[in-house]
Amino acid sequence: AEADAIREGLEEIRKDIREGTFHFTAAKEDIHLHIESALTEKLGDTGRKLHTARSRNDQVATDLRLFCRRAIDRIDAGILELQKAFLEMGNREHDLIIPAYTHLRLAQPDLAAHQLKDRCEKFHRDRQRLADCRQRTNIMPLGSAALAGTSLPIDRSKTQTALGFDAIAPNSLD
């Protein structure tokens, strides 16, 4: 019952934030304090249970990784769309001859498709770097608590799966 109330309260807070009706104040130092305060205002002491077995350090580290993971995915999707557009243009303009430059000087004629394919290869390497970054980012720190873990019996694997992390941080200090 309490878990459902917390979940519903968080959904209401998310809605308020998205609609721009959530009141932020400098008196509360970060988003976590804002959310916990709003939840406690809605639910009383039940709202304080939001961070049971989860320190604010835990929450910040986890939120940062979730934020970065979403950003990486958006950037990767954008680069993929750009690659598709370049390939489509290269296929459409496969006979188009354009000037090629070296050291900012006209060098020789080249095919536009060749230049566009070059950009796609570079984008491919960028996407590989993003995939590596995502893999390194997508490790769940939640459960590390403030420093050396929590004494409460928590199921980190269940949380990992629910949040879509590939692995659990093997050391709470990392």
Question: Each predicted region: which residue ranges?
Answer:
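A helix-coil-helix interface module used to build multimeric assemblies
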Residues: 1-149, 153-162, 166-167
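Amphipathic, heptad-repeat alpha-helical segments used for oligomerization and assembly
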Residues: 166-174
